Each structure stands twice: as structure tokens, then as C-alpha cells.
């Protein structure tokens, strides 16, 4: 399991992101920020989901190219399942489910808030205990 290659997909709000992991090591990641919301002073949910629909394919292809991998190297997909904007989540979940089904690999639903917390463990064997996590999101 340590060398398993996992593709991570994140579309919970207004950033489209993908990352490749080999075991606990992040190989490469890309985050596309949606500038379409700037003039509105906040995120417009409908625009966010449309932008995810436009950006997700290129972001996933880009992360694979940067890592010099193809979809055939991916052994599982982790995707944000919530909480977040319903339309944005639907785009990411649908894309990930389609890939997982087409590649016949496992799909893992990830809680967005728990993902923030567990990101502290990326690249770490352990964290010194006890530790406290304050999470402010949104």
C-alpha cells in the first residue's frame, strides 16, 4: 500500500485542484484559482461549478504530465465529497466517479474539513503529541 499512486481531486468551492501521491509522498499538485469571482466580492456558486467543469480536465492532465505519469499509473482516486458548494462538489465527484469506473480502481470520498486537518501529516512520519489543531475555513 505504501507505493500506491492516488489521484486527489478537490472542487469544494472556487479552486480546482488535483494532486498525485505515492504513498504518503505528494508527487505533484496543481491548483487553478477562479478569478471570475473577483468583481463580485465573493464566490458565485453557479460560476464556480461552471469553472470547475472547464478547468478540471486540464488540471488533472497537467498534474499527470508534470509527474510524467498517465492514468494507467493511478491506482485510486480521492475526491472531496463535502462540505462545500453543491454544484462544485457535483462536478468533482462526477469526474472522479467516471474516472474510477473507467479505470476500474477504488474511489475514496474525502471530508473537506478532515482533509485540512490531515494535510498536516503529508510528508511527516509522525507529529509530536499532544498537538492542537485550529481550523478556520470558508
Enumerate the predicted regions with their spans.
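Short acidic/glycine-rich loops and adjacent helix/strand connectors
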Residues: 1-137
Amino acid at each position: 500500500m505504501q507505493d500506491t499512486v492516488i489521484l486527489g481531486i478537490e472542487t469544494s468551492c472556487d479552486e480546482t485542484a488535483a494532486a498525485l501521491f505515492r504513498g504518503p509522498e505528494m508527487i505533484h499538485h496543481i491548483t487553478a484559482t477562479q478569478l471570475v469571482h473577483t468583481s463580485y466580492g465573493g464566490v458565485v456558486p453557479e460560476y464556480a461549478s461552471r469553472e470547475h467543469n472547464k478547468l478540471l480536465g486540464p488540471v488533472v492532465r497537467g498534474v499527470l504530465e508534470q509527474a510524467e505519469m498517465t492514468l494507467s499509473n493511478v491506482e485510486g482516486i480521492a475526491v472531496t465529497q463535502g462540505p462545500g458548494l453543491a454544484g462544485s462538489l457535483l462536478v468533482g465527484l462526477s469526474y472522479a466517479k467516471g474516472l474510477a469506473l473507467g479505470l476500474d480502481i477504488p474511489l475514496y470520498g474525502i471530508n473537506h474539513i478532515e482533509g485540512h486537518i490531515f494535510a498536516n501529516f503529508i510528508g511527516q512520519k509522525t507529529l509530536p503529541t499532544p498537538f492542537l489543531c485550529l481550523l478556520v475555513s470558508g
